């Protein structure tokens, strides 16, 4: 039996973090979590990390697509926070953001980690950005590091 799995160390990985400015008090904590994880666990150097800031979650897929098309990165982390309000706007924004980022990953055969909070309340978002429920930015970075290595392993073995 052949088992393919990745580890989380990726010293030479070039990573782009595409981050929404909307709800910045939350997403800055997600960014801190992602950066800490990339550096501490992945051993990724500052020189290999590029942060791209966009206005909101809807803009994340387009920026991620441009980053992917450059061919300069091994993976992308998308960070943002979409909080449900009293209108259907949440469903459109969260759904299109998720779908667009998945499309980028498949189109460019590049890992795109989804670190976009989609919560019903501001309290839930706060919990997921570094308090009770961990830091989803850090979790997205772990996922990305592992997928970078999994795809490299697959390329070597297949």
From Swiss-Prot:
InterPro entries: LS, LS/RS, LS/RS_sf. (2S)-2-hydroxy-3-oxobutyl phosphate binds at residues 86-87, 128. The active site is at residue 89. Pfam families: DMRL_synthase. It catalyses: (2S)-2-hydroxy-3-oxobutyl phosphate + 5-amino-6-(D-ribitylamino)uracil = 6,7-dimethyl-8-(1-D-ribityl)lumazine + phosphate + 2 H2O + H(+). One of its GO terms (biological process) is riboflavin biosynthetic process. Keywords: Riboflavin biosynthesis, Transferase. It is an enzyme of class 2 (transferase). 5-amino-6-(D-ribitylamino)uracil binds at residues 22, 57-59, 81-83, 114. Pathway: Cofactor biosynthesis; riboflavin biosynthesis; riboflavin from 2-hydroxy-3-oxobutyl phosphate and 5-amino-6-(D-ribitylamino)uracil: step 1/2. Its EC number is 2.5.1.78. Catalyzes the formation of 6,7-dimethyl-8-ribityllumazine by condensation of 5-amino-6-(D-ribitylamino)uracil with 3,4-dihydroxy-2-butanone 4-phosphate. This is the penultimate step in the biosynthesis of riboflavin. This is 6,7-dimethyl-8-ribityllumazine synthase. It comes from Shewanella sp. (strain W3-18-1). The lineage of its organism: Bacteria, Pseudomonadati, Pseudomonadota, Gammaproteobacteria, Alteromonadales.
